[in-house]
Curated annotation (Swiss-Prot):
Annotated positions binding substrate: W98
Cofactor(s) of this protein: FMN
Pfam families, alphabetized: FMN_red
Annotated source species: Methylocella silvestris (strain DSM 15510 / CIP 108128 / LMG 27833 / NCIMB 13906 / BL2)
EC category: oxidoreductase
Its EC number(s): 1.6.5.2
Protein name, entry field: NAD(P)H dehydrogenase (quinone)
PROSITE patterns with a match to the protein in the record: FLAVODOXIN_LIKE (PS50902)
Taxonomic lineage: Bacteria, Pseudomonadati, Pseudomonadota, Alphaproteobacteria, Hyphomicrobiales
Keywords: Flavoprotein, FMN, NAD, NADP, Nucleotide-binding, Oxidoreductase
Length: 199
């Protein structure tokens, strides 16, 4: 059985919901799954004034956690066309793991959210995937076996590079069922690939 870590940062809860769906999909494929979040860098007073979702149940991850999993699925909201500074800060601290090759051969994947349909989803996914490739992970995207990729009857996230959601400029839009289904699909695929690589 593959061990999968869903590692995320979510300021307003959209990525938290996507992380739960990713984890659900991985569990459906028989994986043992943990959901963890990276530390918040925004001072508490500012986070409260900005209405950040501060009641997230997932425990905070440590760098040492990463090498204990067969797969790591990373999710974060987009910040001006790149991953959030919270996630970048966390991954930047994993240089020791990189130096030892501790993550080589593990499976990696990425998911994200943006405020708008063309708000930088794919470039954000690439900013995550680039990091994972440097760490030696084998990348799994959201392949076209997921039928929701081809929908034209609704505005929806999703890319061959990873599951995505659109939150709206004011954060009022929650992940749609199609977007959550894409996240579950990607979680399943990662768990399946990790299981095969683990043997």
């Amino acid at each position: 059985m593959a061990k999968v870590l869903v590692l995320y940062y979510s300021a307003y809860g959209h990525i938290e919901k996507m992380a739960e769906a990713v984890a659900e999909g991985a569990r459906e494929a028989g994986a043992e799954v943990d959901i963890k979040r990276v530390p918040e860098l925004v001072p508490l007073e500012i986070a409260q004034k900005s209405h950040f979702k501060l009641d997230q149940a997932a425990p905070v991850a440590t760098i040492a956690d990463l090498e204990h999993y067969d797969a790591i699925i990373v999710g974060t909201g987009t910040r001006f066309g790149r991953m959030s500074s919270q996630m970048a800060n966390f991954l930047d601290q994993a240089g020791g793991l990189w130096m030892r090759g501790a993550l080589n051969g593990k499976v990696g994947a990425a998911f994200t959210s943006t405020a708008t349909q063309h708000g930088g989803q794919e470039v954000t996914l690439f900013s995550i995937i680039t990091n994972l490739l440097h760490f030696g992970l084998v990348i799994v995207g959201l392949d076209y076996g997921f039928a929701g990729q081809g929908r034209l009857d609704e505005i929806t996230g999703g890319s061959p590079y990873g599951a995505t959601t659109i939150a709206a400029s004011d954060g009022s839009r929650q992940p749609s069922e199609t977007e959550l289904a894409g996240a579950r699909y990607q979680g399943r695929r990662v768990a399946e690939v990790a299981g095969k690589l683990k043997g």
